[in-house]
């Protein structure tokens, strides 16, 4: 979770909101792009039936990207009926171990890009394209 926090807060104009029970949400211009979800009846442990307490939500660019992530062989990403037709994927915190630091950063950046103002996103992309070339 520390790396998620670092990556999210490195994005321009991002703020971190923390719920009363300590769950972080990352927001850019009032728009949520990633969060630690509270227990919900739509996300339950398949073995115990208990509501999951360790679910992260990441926005994605579109439903095509969502489908690609859901088809990932590692089985890290999932969804629930609540998110049908919505460009977001879910992931359990223990499954962060299955993705490396760069992939997590990319997930956060892509989520942020879906919610950031176009001007801010364009500037960020230009700055980072120059650094990598």
What are these regions (language model features)?
Residues 1-133:
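Charge-dense, helix-prone N-terminal extensions
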């Amino acid at each position: 979770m520390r790396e998620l926090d670092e990556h999210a807060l490195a994005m321009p104009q991002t703020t971190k909101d923390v719920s009363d029970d300590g769950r972080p949400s990352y927001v850019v211009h009032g728009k949520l792009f990633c969060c630690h979800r509270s227990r919900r009846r739509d996300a339950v442990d398949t073995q115990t039936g208990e509501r999951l307490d360790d679910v992260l939500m990441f926005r994605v660019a579109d439903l095509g990207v969502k489908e690609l992530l859901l088809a990932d062989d590692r089985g890290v990403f999932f969804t629930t009926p609540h998110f049908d037709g919505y460009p977001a994927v879910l992931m359990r915190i223990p499954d962060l171990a299955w993705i490396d630091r760069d992939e997590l950063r990319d997930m956060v950046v892509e989520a942020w890009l879906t919610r950031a103002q176009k001007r801010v996103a364009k500037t960020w992309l230009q700055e980072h394209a120059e650094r990598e070339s």
